[in-house]
Amino acid sequence: PGWTLRVVSNKLPALRIEGDLNREGEGIYDKMNGIGAHEVVIETPRHTETLVTMPLKGVENVLRAYRDRIVDLKQDQRLRYVLVFKNHGVAAGASLEHSHSQIIALPIVPKRVTEEIEGAKTYFHYKDRCVFCDIIRQELQQKHRMITENKY
């Protein structure tokens, strides 16, 4: 088909890149326009191929595409948070059967994300250790929830 991976605007975007935020207060509430980015990463031209079945180089291309899109979206001063997510199958909410993922860039950092970051900072302040490193160490040691392990 002449391509290995494509990134396109979502046909039914939750947010639009064009326009101004027009952030303003309305009483105790704040409001703004639905500005942001909503993109679809088409991970392969082959309809039946998935991240699990594609060659390592294909997975590498997908991860590089995520990185490149995040770097580009960070250039837009209106955007504060980028989320990459993947739904697989109708039961998970995917509207396309073809292997794809999505990228959403928001003008705000979601409250839950801010709370998790603050919690990680507090943990580090009290223990002088990274909470995520401690979680990984514990999971590797206990192996209760581990599915597989490799050198990566």
Feature-to-residue mapping (PLM):
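HIT superfamily nucleotide-processing domains
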Residues: P1-Y152
